[in-house]
Amino acid sequence: IDTPGHSDFSSEVERVLDMADGVILLTDAAEGCLPGTSFVMKKALAQGLRPIVIINKIDRKDSRPKEVIDEVFDLFVALGANDEQLDFPILYASGRDGWAVKELDQPKENLHSLLNLILEHVPKPKVEIDKPFAMLSTLLYADSFLGRCLVGRVGQGTARINQNVKAINLEGQKVDSGRLTKLLRFEGTKKVPVEEVMAGDIVIIAGLTKATVADTICDLTVEKPLPSTPIDPPTMSITISVNSSPLAG
């Protein structure tokens, strides 16, 4: 999963991070940390996610990996990272050529080092299979065939095609109900149709027409919504001051 690279009014960054068990910071070996890095990393660190740092484009002639690593460390300190988060693993990579290594003198052949590090460093998802189905709606997804769909991570239980479910808002009020007409599970970047989804899966569901972002899609017996970051209301700020220009008149 990926987050927006900037602050917004919809709290989308926070909701996307709710689906994650770890975080990878991909930074340019020459340019270093960009302005958007600070906002997203602050949210990720605040949620207790442990980062993996990848220094990308290491084959650039103007790369400066040591300085960039120091910049990343200083940024994490400024953002309030704890000791465990500051002890982050580092990989050097070239996304264009498709390789990542722990040390620059290692053979540069594939991304196995990254995949192995994810398995070692990122904790397993904390899921409760035995509880009734509940999923937090994180994003809306439009499909020309399925219509209005909801994207989210299953927080507990399992759900099957044609199962009757309801949607409740953050106050626990029922806002929609219906039947799960389609289930798609993300496998990498692919969307795979499935008959059943379970806790820990990131999925797309179809069948509800009124449910929206931050609602809990759940079994009919569930009464309490999953915790979520609400959508901020539309905001406009205006500053009115005295015209102090020498040309005022």
PLM feature segments, named:
Residues I1-G249:
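Structural and coupling elements of P-loop NTPases
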